[in-house]
């Protein structure tokens, strides 16, 4: 009985803390990678609570979705994607399962960070698997270029200002 009561109290406390932080203007941000999460934390400061789905040691092309990812996406106010189809193998089912209209592509809470930078290595002509590991939409590892970090940060700043206009 005591264990059940402890679990119930913990769940209620989590719900209250989550609701209070959101009511105080904290945005829940989910990102594809830790790199994007780091940028979001630096830009948003104490106004954001950031969760990265892919860990730094993981290949961001092949992330094994977890149930906790669906919950994070369901609660998110903003999702920041690498884009360029990097997440194609694992993100679409998460977005669908999240049932969160705010973070769907094209919605106010969806940011494709690749749209803020110049993309390199966009292949031309017919693309086949015989060419090896080719990214049809261009190199999605653009965030590794140090100068692009500033451009991504500016896009994140603009999106956060749109979502929290009183704090802009």
Q: Residues of each region from the PLM?
A:
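Positively charged n-region of N-terminal signal peptides that target proteins for export
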Residues: 1-5
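Extracytoplasmic metal-acquisition and chelation regions
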Residues: 23-168
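Bacterial N-terminal signal peptides
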Residues: 6-18
């Amino acid at each position: 009985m005591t264990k059940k009561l402890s679990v119930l109290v913990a769940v209620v406390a989590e719900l209250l803390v989550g609701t209070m932080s959101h009511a105080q203007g904290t945005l829940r941000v989910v990102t594809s990678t830790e790199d994007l999460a780091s940028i979001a934390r630096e830009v948003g400061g104490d106004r954001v609570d950031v969760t990265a789905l892919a860990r730094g040691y993981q290949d961001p092309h092949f992330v094994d979705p977890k149930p906790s990812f669906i919950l994070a996406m369901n609660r998110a106010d903003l999702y920041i994607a690498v884009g360029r189809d990097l997440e194609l193998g694992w993100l679409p089912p998460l977005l669908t399962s999240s049932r969160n209209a705010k973070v769907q592509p094209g919605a106010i809470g969806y940011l494709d960070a690749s749209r803020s930078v110049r993309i390199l290595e966009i292949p031309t002509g017919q693309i086949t698997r015989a060419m090896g590991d080719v990214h049809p939409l261009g190199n999605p590892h653009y965030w590794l270029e140090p100068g692009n970090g500033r451009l991504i940060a500016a896009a994140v700043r603009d999106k956060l200002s749109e979502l929290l206009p009183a704090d802009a």
